[in-house]
Design a protein with these regions (language model features):
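Carboxylate-rich, polar loop motifs that coordinate divalent cations or form catalytic acidic clusters
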Residues: 1-533
């Protein structure tokens, strides 16, 4: 019996790449060649695609396109049918379009153990073959129906795609002496990276045009030029997949929770699909820590984490750490924003104002009042600093050097019956003449021109879930939660919920024209949101 698994795929009205997710790749596990693309199976990042005629990477194939998993064990392109076959941890997936419309067959339906490891996939003129180590499975190349299990294939002319090699690859002598650019060295069946670390070669493939591809254990890909006798390294993917924050300029700087694999910070150019990784393990002055907030001040990028703030000076290309010795109040740095001369820092234990040049705290007088307060969000709006905490919403007027309870400013008549019930002010967002605040009770707004407060909608519109991020575009409001996100029409209050498994927890949002960017615990996702009407 075949099972079509669409649990990770959006509705059919979406085109395959209306949703795209970028992740940490992990090891390169397998390589195959299609009509126009070289496909790379990765440990964590789905399938990477390199366009052989344009000589560039395109958007990857992940669960956002309908794959059953982002952990790809092996893959194979069947040239006779144009089908891309993919072995994941628990199922065999295939697609005739090689983009979307994926069919997933659990291994149990193929009379294979659920935890079988498919080492490689191949095809003969008539069938598709799976190498499961101790046995070989013959499949119908159109339907994927099992046609038998063999200890040895009953065909000889099987074209196999490359597989992951655990014991090391024996590099052919004619390429063993190739040079490698960008500070890498080829040493037998391993690479030495620019920092002196040994990186295993995990996959080898030679194309029909005699190009040579090597995949490495850290996700780096190497393209070999036979005429130049040179390998060129490529990096595609993020330093980690749990994205809690990203900056919103031309280049996105992404960061998140540190995990078991080496973490870091990524500079990502979405137009060129270029990734520059700053690895905690080897980058000077970078400390391994989870990052929860970021702000681009123009000359610098600030990242707030568990043990302090990492500051990157763009011109000097230099990192430094600001910690409690410079006046931080301690606790995880949850939020940051900046004015002309200072960066305002909110932590799980209070607030601080750090001078941009000296990198030291400059006291305002409000620090004792907010001591041990959980600061959810800070938004600098003109000469005011809006501060959302677990118990209260404050507005600090810098010119007056005075801290106000939000109830002490403006006309409260439209929320008078709810003003004393409001708490947990999670997110603050300025859009046009409005300041929007997401709270446990609902979304409230302050009209800066009229000085008037209003309740936009109550918590029922987002089922009482915690709001982690907000974004606005004309009449549309986007709310990121622990279970995807909601789009709400502020004129008609029509709600659209997006809770696909490949989204997970949405931590950060940004709208750039027709594209909604989402930082989630499953990666950095872009969505062509205006197509969904």
């Amino acid at each position: 019996m075949l099972t079509i698994n669409l649990h990770g795929q959006p509705e059919t009205e979406f085109s395959p790449f209306d949703w795209v997710t970028y992740r940490q790749t992990g090891r390169i596990q397998s390589i195959t060649e299609g009509f126009a693309y070289i496909y790379f199976a990765t440990e964590e990042g789905g399938i990477l695609r390199y366009h052989t005629f344009q000589n560039q990477f395109d958007d990857p194939i992940t669960q956002a396109q309908g794959l059953s998993s982002n952990n790809i064990r092996s893959l194979h392109f069947d040239r006779e049918t144009g089908t891309l076959w993919v072995a994941t941890k628990h199922s065999l997936d295939y697609s005739y379009t090689r983009e979307g419309n994926w069919t997933s067959i659990p291994y149990g339906n193929l009379a294979l153990p659920k935890n079988v490891h498919i080492r490689r996939i191949g095809s003969s003129p008539a069938y598709v073959w799976l190498d499961a180590g101790a046995s070989y499975l013959k499949l119908d190349r159109v339907s994927g129906i099992s046609l038998g299990v063999f200890t040895i294939p009953d065909e000889e002319k099987i074209l196999w795609s490359s597989s992951r090699v655990l014991a090391g690859i024996n590099i052919p002598e004619d390429i063993a002496n190739y040079t490698v650019t960008e500070g890498w060295l080829l040493n037998g069946n391993q690479f030495l990276d620019p920092f002196g670390r040994t990186i295993d070669i995990t996959s080898f493939y030679q194309t029909r045009f005699s190009d040579i591809w090597l995949g490495a254990g850290d996700g780096t890909l190497f393209l070999g030029d036979a005429q130049m006798e040179t390998f060129y390294p490529f990096t595609f993917g993020l330093a980690n997949s749990d994205i809690t924050t990203f900056t919103k300029e031309n280049d996105f700087w992404t960061a998140g929770r540190s995990g078991f694999t080496s973490g870091g910070i990524t500079r990502f150019n979405p137009e060129e699909l270029q990734f520059d990784l700053f690895d905690f393990e080897v980058t000077i002055n970078m400390n391994d820590q989870s990052i929860y907030s970021s702000v681009d001040t123009g000359d610098e990028i600030w990242f707030g984490g568990e043990i302090g703030i990492l500051v990157y000076k763009k011109k000097e290309k230099f990192w430094r750490l600001i910690d409690e010795a410079k006046g931080l109040p301690g606790g995880h740095i949850i939020t940051m924003d900046h004015d002309t001369s200072h960066v305002w820092v909110g932590t799980s234990r209070g607030i601080a104002r750090i001078h941009k040049d000296s990198k030291r705290s400059r006291l305002t007088g409000i620090e004792p009042f907010l001591h041990e307060s959980f600061i959810y969000d800070i938004e600098v709006i003109e000469d005011q600093v809006w501060i959302g905490t677990s118990s209260q919403l404050y507005v600090y007027h810098q010119d007056q050097q005075a801290l106000y309870d939000f109830r002490d400013m403006g006309d409260l008549s439209r929320i008078s019956h709810q003003q004393d019930l409001l708490k947990n002010f999670w997110e603050i967002y300025e859009y046009k003449q409005w300041v929007y605040i997401a709270s446990e009770k609902g979304l409230i707004a302050y009209d800066k021109k009229r000085g008037q407060w209003s309740m936009v909608f109550e918590k029922a519109h987002y089922s009482g879930r915690k709001i982690n991020a907000m974004a606005f575009s004309d009449e549309y409001c986007f709310l990121g939660t622990n279970f995807g996100f909601d789009r709400i029409d502020l004129n008609r209050f029509f709600q659209r919920n997006y809770s696909y498994p490949f989204l997970g927890r949405v931590n950060d949002l940004f709208i750039s024209d027709d594209v909604l960017w989402l930082g989630t615990n499953k990666g950095l996702t872009k969505f062509q949101w205006t197509k969904d009407f």
